């Protein structure tokens, strides 16, 4: 007789190859996916908690590869504003946050992500990130957390204005106190806010410290043309080339946005094993169309991010749709290529690509025996999803965070959506 912590019965599973299984059951034990098999294989099994999987799809938890949890309280403020939004709104706002503000903002972000099927995220940092880490630990989520580091530029104000040494010391302290916290769910990374606000000294120190502590680096890169222009004028190199010269490009680097990349940039970053994150809605609203198909063709690992709640929401399902149709319109239609950005590719970005980006591709990103039980159950027995002749296509085109019924992180059931009757009664 096999004992499980959670047993999901009579469900369908999204396999790592993006095909959907026939009806099966999933056994979870000690934070891991222990067994996936037919109902007959679980006939003698017992579980602490049993979930009815009928009409549900078990899929990997989505991973938000680039967000700003400290901007949760800024929702709705930056839409329809003239550039530069980050200097006029984001940095001044973050600079004035109190520790309790960052904590509450972190709590709200975690709650929204869990409800929308996101089980892990990478935060490129703000202020008082120790309080964000507290919120993550309490929520049960998984996260790679960095502290925003900047030491130059007229846009830096208040609590975000530091010397290079101060910025590094603060991240080291965060690492000392929180690395591996929450049963291993929290990782502490270093950050390069962007090349326009980080000196050579700071970038060098970030690279050295990340290497010494065997951790990651989170950077905004090639987000907008001003950044590229700055680099060309100051360093006579494009941003990716400059960071490569500084020894930063490598497998432990996560770059967000990646809009203004040249073909040489793409080849260089793919060769170095850089993990790239696209933020479709943020990119289209402020920066332009990324070369996502070309980046994938170069063999780079690509994930998706929401870039925080300030302009919209924290729903990776929405990001998949926006990237799909923007790439079809911009790259597909001119060459009559309807498969320039396929639905299975987008689902892989939202799961496996994100797992690679946060350094856990070996244990996260797919529903497979021996991987961590970071799973979501999607209600597919609904009129906007069923019937369908291709469930994977329909998930990308029609599903959203409201279709998430259950969220399991690290083997713990953190969220169960109330039934329609329960919602009406409440």
What is each model feature region?
Residues 11, 372-414:
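C-terminal cap of metal-dependent C-N hydrolases
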Residues 77-141, 167-182:
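Alpha-helical scaffold segments that flank or form the walls of functional sites
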């Amino acid at each position: 007789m096999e004992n499980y912590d959670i047993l999901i019965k009579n469900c369908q599973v999204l396999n790592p190859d993006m095909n959907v299984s026939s009806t099966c059951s999933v056994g979870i034990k000690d934070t891991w996916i222990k067994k996936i098999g037919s109902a007959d294989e679980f006939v003698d099994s017992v579980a602490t908690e049993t979930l009815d999987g009928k009409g549900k799809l078990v899929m990997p938890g989505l991973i938000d590869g680039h967000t700003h949890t400290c901007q949760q309280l800024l929702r709705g403020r930056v839409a329809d504003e003239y550039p530069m939004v980050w200097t006029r709104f984001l940095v001044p706002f973050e600079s004035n946050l109190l520790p309790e503000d960052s904590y509450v903002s972190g709590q709200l972000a975690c709650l929204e992500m869990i409800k929308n099927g996101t089980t892990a995220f990478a935060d490129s940092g703000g202020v008082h990130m120790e309080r964000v880490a507290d919120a993550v630990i309490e929520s049960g989520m998984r996260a790679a957390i960095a502290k925003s580091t900047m030491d130059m530029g007229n846009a830096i104000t208040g609590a975000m204005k530091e010397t290079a040494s101060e910025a590094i010391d603060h991240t080291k302290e965060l690492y000392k106190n929180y690395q591996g916290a929450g049963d291993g769910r929290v990782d502490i990374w270093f950050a390069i806010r962007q090349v326009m606000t980080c000196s050579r000294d700071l970038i060098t120190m970030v690279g050295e410290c990340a290497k010494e502590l065997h951790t990651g680096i989170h950077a905004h890169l090639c987000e907008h043309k001003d950044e590229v222009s700055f680099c060309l004028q100051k360093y006579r190199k494009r941003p990716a080339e400059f960071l490569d010269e500084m020894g930063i490009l490598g497998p432990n680097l996560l770059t967000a946005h990646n809009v203004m990349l040249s073909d040489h940039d793409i080849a260089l970053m793919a060769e170095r094993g850089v993990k790239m994150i696209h933020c479709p809605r943020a990119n289209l609203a402020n920066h332009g169309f990324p070369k996502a198909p070309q980046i994938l063709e170069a063999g780079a690992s690509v994930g998706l991010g929401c870039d925080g709640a300030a302009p919209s929401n924290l729903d990776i399902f929405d990001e998949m749709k926006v990237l799909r149709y923007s790439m079809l319109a911009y790259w597909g239609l001119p060459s009559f290529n309807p498969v320039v950005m396929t639905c299975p590719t987008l689902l892989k970005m939202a799961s496996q690509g994100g797992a690679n980006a946060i350094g856990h591709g070996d244990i996260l990103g797919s529903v497979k025996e021996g991987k961590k039980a970071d799973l979501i159950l999607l209600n597919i027995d609904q009129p906007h999803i069923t019937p369908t002749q291709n469930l994977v296509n329909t998930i990308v085109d029609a599903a959203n965070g409201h279709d998430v019924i259950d969220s399991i992180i690290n083997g713990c059931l953190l969220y169960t959506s109330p039934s329609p009757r329960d919602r009406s009664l409440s």
